[in-house]
Regions:
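Thiamine diphosphate
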Residues: 5-135
Length: 135
């Protein structure tokens, strides 16, 4: 069974005594154990970055570093989702995600409609929010 947002929420009960980053790392580890899940984005394979630090328990063969090309990244996510993968698309900052809105709104959102429900894509989009140090 492939993971979905609901399954992710149900799998992890919030523990206020554990740091947010530790719980995020645990959630990414769980996703990394699921068949078909891949992680791609910017700064995901660069040690010392906030995004990398939450992926330390994810198998390296599931993590793909991409250049700064947000629309291309979301296009890859669309293709992977159409092939049955569950891509976790990681953007280091939310304002980088804005550059991928064409692929997100005009393509990913409409795949099910355009294929007459032939494709039901599953995608997880993750981004950091904060003024200096989001995590």
């Amino acid at each position: 069974m492939t993971p979905s947002f609901l399954m992710l929420v149900l799998a992890f009960e919030w523990n206020s005594k554990v740091a947010y980053a530790a719980q995020l790392r645990e959630a990414m580890k769980w996703l990394g154990e699921q068949e078909g899940t891949v992680f791609l984005g910017q700064a995901v394979a660069v040690p010392g970055t906030a995004m990398f630090n939450t992926l330390t328990d994810v198998p390296l063969e599931k993590v793909f570093e991409l250049p700064v090309a947000e629309e291309m990244q979301m296009g890859m996510v669309n293709g992977l989702a159409l092939e049955g993968f569950v891509p976790v698309s990681i953007f280091p900052r939310w304002n980088f995600l804005l550059l991928a809105m064409n692929q997100l709104i005009n393509h990913l959102d409409k795949i099910s409609i355009m294929s007459n429900n032939g494709f039901k894509t599953k995608v997880i989009i993750r981004t950091g929010v904060g003024s200096q140090r989001p995590l």
